[in-house]
Each structure stands twice: as structure tokens, then as C-alpha cells.
Amino acid sequence: DRLINELTFYSKIDTNKIPYTFNKINVNSYFRDCAEEVGLDMESRGIELGYFNYVNEDVEVIADAEQMKRVINNIISNSVKYLDKPKGIINIRIKDVGDFIQVEIEDNGRGIATKDLPYIFDRFYRTDSSRNSSKGGSGIGLSIVKKIIEDHGGRIWATSKEGIGTEMHF
């Protein structure tokens, strides 16, 4: 079901027909709500979720709330898939870095090999470790994330250390 939804959504990306609805969003309340929503699922899985907001209360951005939620959910879903420690940890940090807001989602999972890092946002790309894993995804989730972020005028990148974890920044 999820694969079909992702493929359908990706076909909309290919034809530039993603239905965006841009509105002013209060950064503080929006990301707090997202973290609370995701936190319930993390708690039921025994994963510790940290939420750190370093943005002033009144900061607003123009964004599509639904599509940004898709971004957050896809990134966190990937983090959960590749957590390999007895105690999984995912941290969400929101920072004001001058002219824009930066979101960081960090996990303590298995990490991504340096050779794979440049390609993780490519359509259908899957790392060697995910190809051999029953938990491996379709390989389009992060390409969807990248397109949404770019359509919002932003950029996304990742840093990672094998055996330590991964950080997604956008």
C-alpha cells in the first residue's frame, strides 16, 4: 500500500503536479505538534525521541504543512528502519540560522557508508546494506523528500558515520 502511494506521488513529482498549499506556519507550534505525533509511535516502539527547538516563539515560515509532514515522516521512517542499537534514539532539532530555519533529524542507527552518501536522494537508490535487509524500502522515499524540500526553496543533505548514525539536514 505504501509503495503504491509513493509511486503515485512520485508520478506527480515527475509531472510537477504535486498539490502544494503554501501558508504561513508558526515554526514552534508546527514542529512541536509533529514531534508529539511521531513521539507516540516512537514510544510504542521503545525508541527515545528528543525534540529541541532553538527558534523564537513567533517565527513563521511559508510552507505546505502536509508536505513538510511527509518529509519528516519519511526521514523518521528511514531512521526507524535502520536503528540497530538496543536503545534507539532519534533527535529532532530546529534551528534559526539567519535567513532560514534548519531542521536536523539525527539517529543512532547503523549509519550510511561514505560511498553511498552522495546517492541516497537519487530515485530508487538503496544502499548495499538495505538491499540485503528485510527492512529495506523502495528507494524513493528520500527522493520524494528532496523534491519537496527543493520545491520549498530549500536544500537537503546528510552526514553519517557507519555504526554511529545519520543526520539529515534541511
Task: Annotate each PLM feature.
Residues S79-V80:
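Short helix-loop "hinge" at the ATP-lid/N-box region of the Bergerat-fold HATPase_c
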Residues I112-R126:
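Short conserved segment of the HATPase_c
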Residues T15-Y20, E60-A63:
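Conserved micro-motifs of the catalytic ATP-binding
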Residues D41-F52:
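Short conserved segments within the C-terminal catalytic ATPase subdomain
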Residues G153-G154:
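Conserved glycine-rich
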Residues T21-G39:
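A conserved beta-strand-to-alpha-helix junction within the catalytic ATP-binding
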